[in-house]
Amino acid sequence: GSQQGLDLIGKTMISPGDKVIVEGPTFLATIQCFRLYGAELISAPVDGQGVKTDELEKLIAEHKPKFVYLIPTFGNPSGALLSAERRKQVLQMAVKHQTLVVEDDPYGDLYFGEAPPPSLLAMSPEVPGSREWLIHCGSLSKVLSPGLRVGWMIAPPELLARATMCKQFSDAHTSTFAQATAAHYLKAGRMPA
């Protein structure tokens, strides 16, 4: 799913010693991935509404990170759900501090009852200029099939071009069968647009 996208972000963006802000706690595989490329991880505190944006802004101003990594919807392992207000604040911070935010969104369509707030990507039109500071990674692995390993990355063009080259060097392309299965699922309208 989105795990390969996170690896491509690490591979194309992180140099040894670069600072990356992550939620504390955050997804173990991401910690391992970013550390593999030499990142110094800085932990931003989380409560029941997700990352504490006042603390996050202090950390951004102090450390000037390469990027901020967040799982706004049902954070792993905390399960925290970043409120709509805080999501907007994160986008405003990205613009104010000219800092990339990586939104890992594998769980955005995996809910029961009331829908979670829109993704940072969906909210970005509300905050002028924020789209250029946002990388969004998504996955079908949680809602369709864990073994499918089909995901996507929406990113600024220059970063996406570098990630595409690294993807092609790594494995040429994702399985044709997996891509066709994902396309069939999406064309059938079983997932919200």
Show where each model-derived region lies.
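Conserved core segment of the aminotransferase class I/II
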Residues: P125-A193
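Conserved core of the PLP fold type I
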Residues: G1-Q98, G108-P128
